[in-house]
Structures are given as structure tokens and as C-alpha cells.
């Protein structure tokens, strides 16, 4: 299971960016940096495949970026991941 802590969000060129700590099974495994500049987030390459597999378990079989954004949004909005997955599915169709 993945989660994030210490989320700091900010306005980037192409939306809201963030920096956070990524945890897998309650162990910090990476610091993620998404500057909302259209590029790939720093710090997730090593965990991309695992994030995609985790996405399947929560019903969100999309890219690691979308799955990570969903996790961050659930933490920032203080809602269960299942609630945020339902919101993402509405948007993603």
C-alpha cells in the first residue's frame, strides 16, 4: 500500500505542483517532486510499476502519475482513497 506525507503544494506553470514523501507499507521510500511544468515527477521512476499495480487494487488502472496524484489529492483533501478514486473515475471516464 502506498501513501504520502508532508505534502507541500504550490502553483506551477501548468497547474498545482507538490513535493511530498512517498511511503510504501509505512516505510518512506522516496521524496516526490512534481513541479507542474508538464514533465514527469522526480522520484517515482523506481516505484512506477508498483504504483501501477497498487492502482489496480484500488480500481484505478492508469499511469503511475495519475495514481500518485490521486493519493496526494486524497491526503490533501482529507478523504479516503476510495472517495478520491470515485472522483477521478468521473473525470477520466
Regions flagged by a language model, labelled:
Residues 1-93:
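Terminal leader/tail segments of proteins
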